[in-house]
A protein has these predicted regions:
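Aromatic-rich carbohydrate-binding modules that target alpha-glucans
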Residues: 76-133, 146-160, 193-249, 257-280
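Substrate-binding/active-site clefts of carbohydrate-active enzymes
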Residues: 271, 275, 281, 285, ...
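Bacterial N-terminal signal peptides
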Residues: 10-18
Length: 793
């Protein structure tokens, strides 16, 4: 960065604040209601309605006094109970208590009707215990009633300026070569020191004026002692911290400033664990995150904190060489930890530990892969996970790093691959790269941000759109993919919204058109996946035109293929739009599409049965049989398949169902009821058994379910009345499925190809005497599956 005398003079003399505003990504002065100027301590008669304080501007090393006078209509006007303050400094740092705690230290003195007084003594700093805080810019305070947890009455937030306090003046930047080659956290061999390296160069070839480390190793105090050095060749800020205890976890942040952009504190984008002051406490209460582990440094900083440990305990993998069996024909179980299990009576409390206990259930079902919805650190605790902010850290909402590894290890023991849903199209404003160059006025990434677009060039983005043409983004994504494959032993990925991996502008009508640049980007990522683990799979949520999807499939990738409408229609007993033949296309390799009847994003077939179509008033028995017939014309089709969790039990809560138990008008990400009690219902258990039987047949006879074995099917709308039909034939084995989706029995003629004994799944035998058109009776809402060999169920 080119520095002139003006910049250097400013850097040496400016007084920099330390507090971060929660609504912005950059640090700034917080303002509140205007407070009257006072040159003396006011009498009760001089107090105005609202907030009053003396002195008008506090000093950190002096006493401060605050009065609140309630106006008619205020929550506390006429209130006779005790009044307490909720108080902090800067952006609610050093808040001494949780909301609603009634202790004498926070109790305001009632000095007259509707007037309360609170004193910070002996000094502002000493009252807060903030003697070492680098700078106090303001005191934030509100007054509340003593029943705030049950019947809240409170004032608005007030902010009182603090002047003449400690300041920080950065030293001139030292230019020095960085001893490490990659950005991130680099422990020494003995673990007693660690080098931090942070990339910083914007699209205008400028960088921040200075960077400092703050953390547990320096009690979060901003000082020139921990000011980072600059390597202009690597574009790194870097610093080596010594005196580290290898067995201890440390929290830290980068604190950076510039005359142009102000100040910002960020975590390390490559850290493997973070602390969140707004959300972690709930995980501790729930027992998901250990109370004995490192906790957020409340009162000492704001924003997400990165964690490092130079010599962490290593996980002892029981299975180190797992490989997916037949990835081109795998059956995947899409799973959201949050809604798969439940702790107590509360929704959204699913954990890794509880999910691990149900692996026998998944194994018995017959799937050979689990696809986890996003688990990389996301904003908040309750989410689908498509709001990522730290890609190398697994979210603590579901458990610890070790528990994630244990889950994957246990899956591998059961012969189940684990795929991870990754979200590289976008990130939230909490991501360090977003915060580093941020437009506070518009709440967007700034124009000079080298990782993000200001606005997405495509119409489907949310949050902040990554620029995948940027070498920095490509390097980051590929490094993350390699890390996930090696550190956690994931067996592959499902990439979210890959249609957005382009810089070519488009609208809803053109975004699906073939985009050669997008193909190049995805092939580049696939090369990293394939080089790291040749057996790993890469699935795309792409939904583009066939010419592009076909090219990606021929390169080795797989693509989501949505069959929800067709199977919802057949599940409801409606023939219109129920054509299954779209599952296959001569222009697409059979292993290229991962077909699904349901996904996290689509409506549940069993719910639509209850709300629309010809089965609204049908018994549960009939509805589950219809869903079993759906499964028979889904799981027998060659090529990869995916099941959404609990679809095998006929889960019939709508995607529009809301957390409060009401029905919304559009799909939402609210937690849904966890219905393990479905297993005790004979009809739902019967559907599970149908899935399990079909999958066992598929797993035991891989040659019969290969693409080469596919011979014929009649699954269009015109085949509805006389029954749908599918035929597979390998070298020695044959299979025929006939299905009736109507509410009445049908008599039909079936092509078997040869006469003789054919075997049903239930063990019964059919003697076929007419190989071209054998008469078969199919009960309503049912299917029959025949093989030319006995099936062992």
């Amino acid at each position: 960065m080119k520095k002139d005398i003006k910049h250097i003079f400013w850097m040496l003399l400016c007084l920099l604040t330390i507090v971060a505003c929660s609504d912005e990504n950059h640090e700034m002065l917080i303002t509140g209601p205007e407070i009257p100027e006072l040159d003396h301590e006011p009498s009760i008669e001089e107090l105005v309605e609202g907030i009053n304080n003396y002195p008008t501007k506090f000093k950190g090393d002096k006493q401060g006094k605050i009065w609140y006078k309630a106006a008619a209509g205020d929550d506390l006007y006429g209130y006779e109970g005790d009044v307490y303050v909720h108080i902090g400094i800067n952006d609610w740092m050093y808040v001494p208590t949780e909301w609603g705690v009634n202790e004498d230290k926070y109790k305001a003195e009632k000095v007259a009707d509707n007037i309360w007084c609170f004193t910070l003594a002996p000094t502002v700093r000493e009252w807060f215990g903030a003697e070492n805080a680098a700078n106090i810019q303001n005191v934030c305070i509100l007054f509340r009633n003593d029943e705030a947890l049950t019947d809240e009455k409170k004032t608005s937030d007030f902010f009182i300026t603090v002047t003449g306090d400690k300041t920080f003046t950065p030293a001139p930047v030292e230019i020095a070569a960085c001893p490490v080659e990659e950005a991130g956290i680099h422990p020494s061999a003995d673990g007693t020191s660690v080098t931090f390296a942070l990339y910083d160069l914007d699209t205008d070839n400028n960088y921040k004026d200075y960077a400092c480390l703050i953390g547990d190793f320096n009690d979060w105090e901003l000082s020139t002692e921990y000011q980072m050095k600059r390597d202009n060749d690597k574009h790194f800020w870097w610093y080596t911290v010594t005196g580290i205890d290898p067995a201890k976890e440390y929290g830290f942040q980068y604190y950076m400033g510039s005359e142009k952009d102000g100040n910002v504190r960020i975590g390390d984008p490559y850290c493997e664990k973070v602390l969140d002051g707004s959300n972690d406490k709930y995980l501790v209460e729930q027992g998901v995150y250990p109370a004995s582990a490192i906790q957020y440094p409340n009162g000492k900083t704001t924003g997400i904190v990165s964690v490092f440990q130079t010599k962490p305990a290593s996980y002892n993998w029981q299975v180190s060489d797992f490989k997916i069996d037949n990835p081109d024909n795998m059956v995947i179980y899409e799973l959201l930890f949050r809604d798969f299990t439940q702790t107590g009576s509360e929704l959204a409390t699913g954990t890794i530990k509880e999910a691990t206990k149900h692996l026998d259930y998944i194994k018995s079902l017959g799937v050979n892969a689990i696809e986890l919805m996003p688990i990389q650190e996301f904003d908040g605790n309750n989410s689908w996970g498509y709001n990522p902010c730290y890609y190398f850290a697994m979210d603590k909402a579901y458990g610890t790093k070790e528990e994630y590894k244990q889950f994957i290890d246990e899956c591998h023991k059961q012969g189940i691959a684990v795929l991870l849903d990754v979200v590289y199209n976008h990130a939230t404003g909490s991501h360090p790269f977003a915060k580093l160059y941020w437009n506070s006025k518009e709440s967007k990434t700034a124009k000079n941000n080298p990782w993000f677009n200001v606005d997405a060039p495509h119409p489907f983005s949310v949050f902040h759109d990554f620029n995948h043409e940027s070498p920095l983004v490509r390097e980051f994504v590929k490094r993350n993919l390699k890390f996930l494959l090696e550190e956690y032993k994931f067996d592959g990925f499902r990439f979210d919204l890959t249609k957005g991996f382009t810089q070519n502008k488009s609208n809803e009508s053109t975004a699906s058109n073939k985009d050669d640049s997008r193909i190049v980007i995805l092939k580049d990522y696939y090369k990293t996946v394939n080089t790291t683990n040749p057996n790993a799979v890469m699935i795309l949520e792409h939904f583009c035109n066939l010419d592009e999807e076909s090219e990606l499939a021929k390169a080795g990738m797989k693509l989501w293929h949505n069959m929800n409408e067709s199977y919802c229609q057949s599940g409801m007993g409606e023939s219109s739009n129920s054509d299954f033949s779209y599952m296959r296309n001569s222009g697409m390799p059979a292993e290229g599409w991962v077909n699904f009847m349901e996904s996290h994003d689509e409506e549940r077939v069993a719910y639509k049965q209850t709300a629309f179509g010809n089965l609204q008033n049908a018994s549960l028995d009939i509805r589950m049989k219809q869903l079993g017939t759906n499964a028979a014309f889904f799981l027998t089709v060659p090529g990869p398949k995916m099941i959404w969790q609990f679809g095998e039990l006929g889960y019939d809560y709508s995607i529009m169902y809301k957390y409060d138990g009401t029905m919304g008008t559009e799909k939402n990400t609210d937690a849904k009821p966890v219905k393990w009690d479905y297993l005790t219902d004979q009809y739902r258990k019967g559907l599970y058994d149908t899935y399990s039987t079909l999958l066992k047949l598929r797993n035991d006879n891989p040659d019969l379910f290969s693409d080469n074995a596919f011979k014929d099917w009649k699954v269009s709308v015109s085949d509805w009345d006389k029954g749908r039909y599918l035929r597979l034939e390998s070298t020695t084995k044959k299979l025929v499925v006939v299905g009736n989706f109507k509410n009445e029995q049908i008599n039909t003629g079936v092509y078997f190809g040869n006469t003789g004994d054919w075997y049903e799944l239930n063990g019964e035998t059919l003697n076929v005497t007419n190989s071209s058109e054998q008469p078969v009776v199919i009960p309503a809402n049912s299917f029959k599956l025949y093989t030319n060999f006995p099936v062992n169920n």
